[in-house]
Amino acid sequence: MFDIGWSELVLIGVVALIAIGPKELPGVLRMVGQWMGKARKMAAEFQGQFQEAMREAEMADLKKSFDEVKEAASGFAGNNLMTSLQKDVSDALRVDALDKPAETSSTTAIEAPATSSEALTTPTTPEAPTPETFVEAEAHAAVNEPLAITREVEQAPVVAQDTAPSEAIKDAKAS
């Protein structure tokens, strides 16, 4: 603490022995030791209070951060989030609205099939494209966006080709 070496301690001891005297020296040393103990206790108490204040400040910061997160999370209440997700899913599932041309206001109601046999006889493969379909696709806002194209593949016999590849393979390689 004071960076005192052995030679300095010996010098202080000799001066104290001469100044105080051998008779009163043990009492003075005891009193100095008690003062040193009190000073150490006070320093430890101050350090403990300082650390406690730092912990309280950290806890206040953590509580403030927690309250901010809690407040932000309250905006995402279960009903609001689920309603938003359900709306997004229902919008994404409205493929029929994108596939059909715009209808007039008089034919906007969706009609249910008259009998259950009509619902069973609907084809699962799409109809062949008509020129109106291409016009509608070009007029759509997402005409330049990539599409996921799927098709039904029929099993065809494998024919060995000794000549140039067919047009289908050329198209597949080009894309």
Curated annotation (Swiss-Prot):
Membrane topology value: Single-pass membrane protein
Principal subcellular localisation of the protein: membrane
GO BP of this protein: protein transport by the Tat complex
Cellular localization per UniProt: Cell inner membrane
Annotated region (Disordered), positions in chain: 100-132, 155-175
Keyword terms: Cell inner membrane, Cell membrane, Membrane, Protein transport, Translocation, Transmembrane, Transmembrane helix, Transport
InterPro entries: TatB
Transmembrane segments: 1-21
GO MF annotation terms: protein transmembrane transporter activity
A cellular-component GO term for this protein: TAT protein transport complex
Bias type Low complexity, positions: 111-132
Record text on subunit structure and interactions: The Tat system comprises two distinct complexes: a TatABC complex, containing multiple copies of TatA, TatB and TatC subunits, and a separate TatA complex, containing only TatA subunits. Substrates initially bind to the TatABC complex, which probably triggers association of the separate TatA complex to form the active translocon.
Annotated function: Part of the twin-arginine translocation (Tat) system that transports large folded proteins containing a characteristic twin-arginine motif in their signal peptide across membranes. Together with TatC, TatB is part of a receptor directly interacting with Tat signal peptides. TatB may form an oligomeric binding site that transiently accommodates folded Tat precursor proteins before their translocation.
Family per record: Belongs to the TatB family.
UniProt protein name: Sec-independent protein translocase protein TatB
